[in-house]
């Protein structure tokens, strides 16, 4: 059963799922789609053409789906935000809608955990199981692969791609692409090691060992792209292939490796 506070504003055309809770002074715009068992807390604003998946939580004063901070944007353009299931969007987070430079939509996968004061700009593409710590800031068109963690107070430059399973340390600043399964740190960020904590949670020991050997082959000597080409030959690990293809396809370049002894 829906629970909607009398002071909440629900615009005509909004589609609300079963068991939705909308608290005092919240706003839900026209043409929104709110899934089942979604809670929109006091003062949160869900703007037009936003979709939020089942079992999600939008906390007080978060703003989802407002127009992009892009001077070329025209308000008559169709744009919005699509968020998957089980999302947590904490207080004062802002998620802007997309632009015609993308497909019109900012997209976030399932199980996102977006902490307070984070900003996700227009046309960002976030995979599943993403964590953004407080005040992480993503500029336009940033892409984050599945299982990526971005530490607090970290800005990411527009068009940067962060591969699957990465960890970006807090108070870093990214301006180049980060290879899957790596840990990056610093201002400007460099690649420091494998994200061993993350890959040990997901993969068995044999796969962790394969990724460790691949990391050493790629980063510790010679030319990075040549190393990636050579490593792809007769490569059986799909995860190692992801690392190699990412390196070969980067457009913003890969930051330098400044290693840690535990890589």
Curated annotation (Swiss-Prot):
Its EC number is 2.3.1.129. InterPro entries: Acetyltransf_C, Acetyltransf_C_sf, Hexapep, Hexapep_transf_CS, Lipid_A_LpxA, Trimer_LpxA-like_sf. It holds the Pfam family Acetyltransf_11. It comes from the Bacteria. Pathway: Glycolipid biosynthesis; lipid IV(A) biosynthesis; lipid IV(A) from (3R)-3-hydroxytetradecanoyl-[acyl-carrier-protein] and UDP-N-acetyl-alpha-D-glucosamine: step 1/6. Keywords: Acyltransferase, Cytoplasm, Lipid A biosynthesis, Lipid biosynthesis, Lipid metabolism, Repeat, Transferase. One of its GO terms (molecular function) is acyl-[acyl-carrier-protein]-UDP-N-acetylglucosamine O-acyltransferase activity. One of its GO terms (biological process) is lipid A biosynthetic process. It catalyses: a (3R)-hydroxyacyl-[ACP] + UDP-N-acetyl-alpha-D-glucosamine = a UDP-3-O-[(3R)-3-hydroxyacyl]-N-acetyl-alpha-D-glucosamine + holo-[ACP]. The keyword Nucleus does not apply. Coiled coil: none annotated. Involved in the biosynthesis of lipid A, a phosphorylated glycolipid that anchors the lipopolysaccharide to the outer membrane of the cell. Homotrimer. Belongs to the transferase hexapeptide repeat family. LpxA subfamily. This is Acyl-[acyl-carrier-protein]--UDP-N-acetylglucosamine O-acyltransferase. It comes from Campylobacter jejuni subsp. jejuni serotype O:6 (strain 81116 / NCTC 11828). The gene is lpxA.
